[in-house]
UniProtKB/Swiss-Prot annotation:
One of its GO terms (cellular component) is nuclear pore inner ring. InterPro entries: Nup188, Nup188_C, Nup188_N-subdom_III. It comes from Schizosaccharomyces pombe (strain 972 / ATCC 24843) (Fission yeast). This is Nucleoporin nup184. GO terms for biological process: mRNA export from nucleus; NLS-bearing protein import into nucleus; protein export from nucleus; protein import into nucleus; RNA export from nucleus.
Amino acid sequence: MGDYLLSWSWILDAFETSDENLSQNKFEELLDARIAAFQQIESPVTGTLNSNKTTEGEEAKLSIYDSSHSISKSQLESVKKISDITGYNEAQVAYVLLVHQYELNTQYFSQLDNDSVLAQEFQRRYYAEIISCWKVLAFLLQACTDADSKWHKMATRLIVSIFQTAQRSGENAQSTTPSIFCVRIIDYLSKMTSQAAPASLTFNGEEAISQWYFFHFNLQLQLLRVIFLSTYSLVVCNSEMAISWFNCMKKTRYLHDQEFMHLDIDTGFSMCKEITNVAIIISINFISLEKQVLSFKDNPSFFMLSGNTIISLHDMITQLSNDSIGAAVSLTWGIALHLLSNSPDNIPLIQNSSVVSSKILQNPQNSFQALIIAALKYDPFTLIHRIISSLEDDPYIDGYSKIMATLFSSAVSYVKFSDSTMLCATTLFKTPQVYQLFENNDSVTRLLNFARARFPFEYSQFVLLLIPTFACLTSKQLVSSELLHMTTFTQSLPSGFKAYEIIPEPNVTGNALIELQESLHLDSYGFFFPNAERSLPKGTRGRIVSVDTYPPVVMWDLNYSLWEAVGISLNYIVRNGLINSHKSFVLTVLSSSVPLFQTDVSGACELVHLASEGLDGELDFINVICDLLDYFLSLSVIEDADYQICVSSLRLLREFTRFAATDVWAYVTRSLVCVGSEKGISLEDVIFDYESINGVYDFTLAFFDLYEILLDNCISTSVVPDDFSIRLKTDFVKRAMRFLCEVFANYLDWKYARIIQQYQIGHRFASLITKLLNVTFGIEYFNPKTTVNKKTLPLRELSHYIVQRFLVQQDSNRYLHPLLSVMDLINLLYTDIFSTISSPRAKAAKMWLISSFCAMKTLICLRGFLNLKPSELERELFSRSPDLFNCLPRLLCCIAPILQLLSALILAPWPSETPSLLAYMINSTDIVGRVCIQILTNPIQSTNIEGSVWKFLSSIMKGQQQGLAVLLFSGKKFPLDRMKSLNHNVDVQLTSKSLISLAEKRLDSFSINDILSQVPVFEFIFLSRNFWTASLGNLQQEANFWNRIVDAIKLPLTVKLDGLSSVAQADLYILAAHATRITAIQLHMSKLNKSNSSKKIIIDPLKDSMKDLVQHAFTITAYDSNIHNALTRAFKHENGDLHISDLRNTGLFPLRYGDNYFYNIKLAKNMLLNTEDTSFKISMMMSANENLSLLDAQAALLRSWSIFICAFVEFVKEDATLSILELKIMKWVLKSLAEDTIDVNVVQELSAERAALVFRISQQTLAIPISNEVKEHLQSILLLTWKAITTTKFSIYEDSNGEMAYYRPLLHVLYNTLNRLLSEEKENLSLSVGFVSGLLQLCHRKLSQLFEKAVINPTIEVYGDIVLLNSLHKCIVNSHLIRGLQSLYISYINDSFSVDNCLRLFSWSHSLLVDGQPYFADAALSFLLICSSSPAGAEQIVMNGFFYSIMESPLSTALSTGGLGLDGSSIQYKIWIRGILPLLFNIVKFLGNRIMNDMREFVLLAFPQIQYALLNWCQPPSSISLASIDESFMIVLLFDLLQQFNPALLQEIRLAELKIEMLEASTI
């Protein structure tokens, strides 16, 4: 494949994405190189294709945009083939193939059925590039005129450069002016009007030809937009431009006379109308009535300064004056000439002004009067209305409206006000921005006053009455009382009504003034009522404004509230069954009111109150709207007007829900059924019977909007419920969701008058279920795993319903299929996004794609979250993964959603092994790496997109996709066609830049101001190195790479953290953590490879700053308890059952550091709407989130350093010079534990991890040779460990939350260190009395506690803790450290009841088995043995019933029968030998005659075992074990001791004879 070439569609997509992270400098550099493209008007994507066979495998090079790109042999073959089929230039074809090289490859071409399909696929991409190029220019032109745009400065410079480099073609090619660029486009546009499809396309069928014309006319329209934007406020229309333009208009009747026959009727007519309408607007803009009223001196380039131009234009426009198409242009030109004739200052400035005056201005047959009169015959106001209405979806409609409004304000003075005038004004000024420009215009003010004066006699002007109010509400200005009230009420008098008197007025001949002599009731003949009485009071005066009609029309002087009158009138129509007879009025009021209620909530609420003033209830106007909708939904047949009223009613209900949700719930749960019923028509009937037949889905989309806001209401009332029934809400939302699911299951098969509505339905449904699932499973409050809460029932019911419909298996994918189908339509959507000129349609297509991918990702994450079986969705996505990768380079807006979807797919848990992505991409494995590299090397991609790529690549290594990872990092592919050969792997370099080297190169551009974008890069490097070294061996790096990594590790020290936000600090810590782990991997590898290179590249650079780094990493300072305490207090007195913990994110999705990290702020804002101090709570939650982000990042840094230190400790074994540093690290970590002041619940796990790390290091320090320096460090470690143990944040005597996980490793450290010092120092070790006594007290108190716990819960962990503390206890008691502490020692035994509890444990030990053995008996006797090493200890043991416990234990039975130890491995035998016998020896030694009675009883009991042990020597030597030797030895020693105190006992048991027998046996 050739080198990468950036497409215009990508550039356009980047502009339209509006990503704040996009680099303007990169854009500017890129477009600077492409300025020449805009001079190639006919084809800005045409370069030069040159043959070049010097490189192996390369056939040609494409030179374009100041760069050269290689064309491979296979590509060149494809170029020639497509060029022959389509008739396009080979250079144009080569460009398209290069920008789509991963998609349009040889394999793709081989799959196409025929040449016609190939031609269409090529044209789709070719015109996407052409049109995208001109859209980019249009974007720059628009940015030039918007001083607030971030692109303004860049766009201005580029546009100036484009205009300045524009040259004429032909004789004067070297001359340049800003207008030349426009002239060249106009000339090309004129040429396009006579172009036909390439001859070669005629052989490819009608579809290919039709497609060519479709793109051809789309390109025309885009060029028209470029002309409009260029001349709207940038380039003054000079003579050359005007002549070129109007020549083209005359030739084509404003571009109307072109061949649209190859398109279908609807498409052809629509495109023809749109092109002609824009051409008319541009023509009016060229004439520029705004400039006509100014002095021509201010515009020296203006074409009106040329008399010849004026005459030429006049002739051309006059020729079209009798054509309705050009009526608006003729009117504009006529007004311009009228203004000129009344401008004595401008006429002299015109060249050949005398000729202009004689031929035009003073010629009655050819004057402006004739033009204006001819134009007015065709009703240009209706034409203006149609033009603006047809262009409502155009991105530049505001500019068009302003131009037409200027014409309207000038032309309205030439005519009487009529219906067409009012309709035109309504269309133009309904946009607030346009109205505000002309609100002070005299003509517009007069027209609006006229409309108010004629109301309600002409109720169609109701929209005009609302325009000023709408403008105020949109700009959030206070609506004046004058706008909300009417001062006149115009109606025709009732037939035969005479109860009025004419008031004579001197000098007044018309519009007679009259006064009512009695009240005039309006019920009998009217339907619009100004007051609740529905009458005009007696004494009301008015003027008869129409004497030529009967009955006469009277304009009454009456002050009344407009909205109150609207409410009263609609209510009267509904209550009296007059809806059908006044359907037009109802439709006018409702459709006109929707935009007002869509503005500010407070303004909308105020309007509802005003409309309800004359009704029964405070918000009764809402009930009127509900009744209207109810009526039309109850009809057996629905007509077009009925349908429009239903749509407007639904839209109004949606807006009413914002401030009157209970009223709307009452209606929808009562009347808005979702399936057919006996009551009449239902939602199902409207959509499936009316909309699917007519292809218009306004009602469906309105219902989506209503349903979504009702769901929001369910969320906002989940904490503080409203007064409406939960059961009714649940019933409605379930039924509605079933209905919407049916809509979604069928919508792809429906007919569409506007395809954009298909995209909108797909987007709305996908967004709706994504939102619903995020709410229900996103925070703890709604989580179905938690205890059921009836307040959240509607949402829980819905979530389960969605899960059941979409997380399905293969045989039930009816609802899943439409969601997946969006991937089958990517080609179509690509055309709509880039090749068509409808911005709303392109935006809707993008949103549909993005929302569908997000919905799939949510479902996949949810499946793992709920531990469900893998669904058909995942299987389908795995099989479609090649298609997803292929579309990545085409759709910038979808890169992040698609990669996030693939990451979720890879990381989702499977019951067995995750499917291999490699297996599904067996024919295109190299595409993954190539596409990722293309995106990463794109000069204008954002940090968000780049981060998505790195995260996806990291997920490949995390998600058991080792096969694909190996190919990615090795630069190899695995083609299917080589499977049969022995050489399966074929080396094919991805590009000159591998993914790993590309990631490491990113480190060169590291900036402290852009930490967030670097975090995914460091994570990828860490994972890739970890994976690579595990799979393919060591990967060597250059020294500068390690310098950058070491610098990253030092960032917490080298960066001034106070100057960073909490989130930025958190990102910095995470980045440093990844860097630390990278070095840890290298240390491990160096140890395995027995290499010392890591010392030089890692340890030496870090050695000097190691202390600060370790202390910073292991000292947790981020947690701010004040924030969290204040947050807890804020929710403590919350009404309802909401706790702050309910707002925690559940972890359904990976969490990002920031103000939404731990607590879900987005949902909390909605849920806390009805609570007190909402803003304070949200602010505190955001602060807590940022604080917890920092805490989590510090924890990650701590754990990374733990990994590093473990690797470092192993490395110390190879380099003894680092041993002192190892000891210092122990001290630094212990100090952080000892001085930690953070809440125990927050740092308990981290404290345990730090303690475990210290223990691990201490295991390694045992081998360090003792020196004075080492001794000092070990003593410091001993004291710091004791300080960490005695910290007040934990208690070793409380183990309810697993505190021993913290203390256990520290006790090990104490033992290791103390034992090492005692083994070396012997009698010379000096420790404080407080330390030794405190340690003894701790041992006895904790052991006593453990003895008690073992009786209740005899686990292996308890046994291990007893053994550990016994060892520590023994270490002290058996050393010189116990000297002088005997009295304290005895007091600890007595105070803690340790001996008593130990004996109790021993008594129960026969039933407290671990792995079937009485290990606790052994542990208990070990403790007693240590205690018996002193006389006082031995006495305490005896006093607490030692002999009784021994003689009552199950062991006594074995002793009394003898034969214990026959198998040599019994734990009881070991207890006897190593526990009881030594303990008896100590007791006899210290207590002597005082225990002889107890001793005699025990000896007599155990005599069979004693006899067995001594006579065991008669057995063959092979039967005598070391244990039996120990046993005999201990018995002999014990009896020798007893000989001193009780010789009679020995005689009693005939011990002398036993000794003789034993000696005789031993000599045999």
